[in-house]
Amino acid sequence: MTKYEVTVYNAQVRKMVEAGEHHPQWDDEWAEFRYIDVTADNEDKARAQIESRYPPGQGFIIDNVAEHYEHQEDE
């Protein structure tokens, strides 16, 4: 399995924040990108995991899905 970093935001929240309002359900931080790590067999399955937790019908947008690489310290 591969670790992916998925970039997500909420379009409804972003629109309301830009208008100086607040979403009744989600906090204002959802207007900005959030980076969520998931482990999946492939990119499509990583996307499906995120969409099940953050449904597009509730305004969530997946901006990017990328393999997550661990940085190793130089010895």
Label the model's feature ranges:
Residues 43-75:
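Short, mixed-charge low-complexity intrinsically disordered segments
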